[in-house]
């Protein structure tokens, strides 16, 4: 039977519940347990697919095509379980399910209420995502005290009663601020946060206390006394140099042993050698490279969270310190690509909408003409095609119909038909809703022999995750290829261009998919690893000049 660990957060948001949950999951996995993680988000959106990255951060895409919270990216980077659409539910999705049932008459004319109908649906979704695992860790988004979180908190309160204390426990993550002027840590916010939680019927079994510095035994004893939590179960989680140290920090305080004991789990001792290896490798840096990230959401790093982590992973596996320099594409549009002179490599990530596109095109032109290593992802590949069509093929004004429906040379257009991850045919047009209607999830891609892409991956066929509506217009492929563009990757049915590269460039690759979603610190991703190695070579060549 599945055991449940419910994780809540208090005092302030952005404490790192997702990292803490994923780290504990990694330790439990290292003890031989099958672990999954579920994120419950209180917002009314059905999913984050149409939300602004400035508000939500990146949208993480699962292999089965779900658009989910970025915390699922943390989950996949820390544990080996592949996340699915069952690992993320929002208030909007829960209410949508309940309203559909009400319209069908499933409630037999009854009055539909938050309790029991919404809470029952929340419990059903949790159990659906947890099925067949030894342990399910369920993270409740938001902060205790927020009105939006109340149905979720009520649902997990009920689950604890229904399952019993040996099948469900509560972990509360809270802030213990350090006041520099007095040199003291303050426990009062934590006390009040737990008081708020207890007022709705939830008594935490474990407290994880986020702080700048390790908590003293006296502070831990004080927190334990005022929150009714065992002293050994008050865990100090101070700021770490790397998030990949956190499994070791939690294990050193016996958090996994506390959890195993409370849930009566049979598990071997944790083998964290894999995580120790990652941390040791991260400490070895023989060179620093500067990689330009040219995007439109550069004010918020979380908008490119998985790419940032993928570059970090590549650095770990190449003994490289990767310094990401963020460039607002509109600044390059205004001031030119000479801003990129000191850069060792250029990356243009995905995005939507016309703003900043011309700046991205200028950055790509600079990379092509100056032989700077380049990696384009999703929109990054599309803008690379536009740049090549305009400046090499000579199709002046070439564009995507996403940005200019009247362009004379629509080198990119809306995909009207494709096969979904499960093999079903999807059909779209300009009037289709924006939400949940893109080409999403893992898709097969065939790599052409003798190409850089084939060399990087080392195999003829790959599966990568997609999130897009527009694709290269096959009408212009022959002309592009004739002028030196190499189509190095195509969809399984050969109808869609998935990867491009240049014949006369040392390292120029672009892909329609999102390789960042499958990178992890243990193995890195070949595309990012080779990109960082190319940046190292370019850096060394610059030094010789």
Swiss-Prot record:
Any one GO CC term of the record: cytosol
Residues bound to L-glutamine: 351, 379-382, 402, 469
Segments for region (Amidoligase domain): 1-265
Binding annotation for Mg(2+): 71, 139
This protein's encoding gene: pyrG
Entry keyword annotation includes Transmembrane: no
Other observations noted: CTPSs have evolved a hybrid strategy for distinguishing between UTP and CTP. The overlapping regions of the product feedback inhibitory and substrate sites recognize a common feature in both compounds, the triphosphate moiety. To differentiate isosteric substrate and product pyrimidine rings, an additional pocket far from the expected kinase/ligase catalytic site, specifically recognizes the cytosine and ribose portions of the product inhibitor.
Domain Glutamine amidotransferase type-1: 290-541
Active site location: 378 (nucleophile), 514, 516
Name of the protein: CTP synthase
Residues annotated for CTP binding in this entry: 13, 146-148, 186-191, 222
PROSITE patterns: GATASE_TYPE_1
Coiled-coil residues: none
UniProt keyword annotations, A-Z: ATP-binding, Glutamine amidotransferase, Ligase, Magnesium, Metal-binding, Nucleotide-binding, Pyrimidine biosynthesis
This enzyme's EC code(s): 6.3.4.2
Keyword Iron: no
Regulation: Allosterically activated by GTP, when glutamine is the substrate; GTP has no effect on the reaction when ammonia is the substrate. The allosteric effector GTP functions by stabilizing the protein conformation that binds the tetrahedral intermediate(s) formed during glutamine hydrolysis. Inhibited by the product CTP, via allosteric rather than competitive inhibition.
Lineage: Bacteria, Pseudomonadati, Pseudomonadota, Gammaproteobacteria, Legionellales
Binding residue positions for ATP: 14-19, 71
Gene Ontology molecular function, alphabetical: ATP binding; CTP synthase activity; glutaminase activity; identical protein binding; metal ion binding
A Pfam entry, by short name: GATase
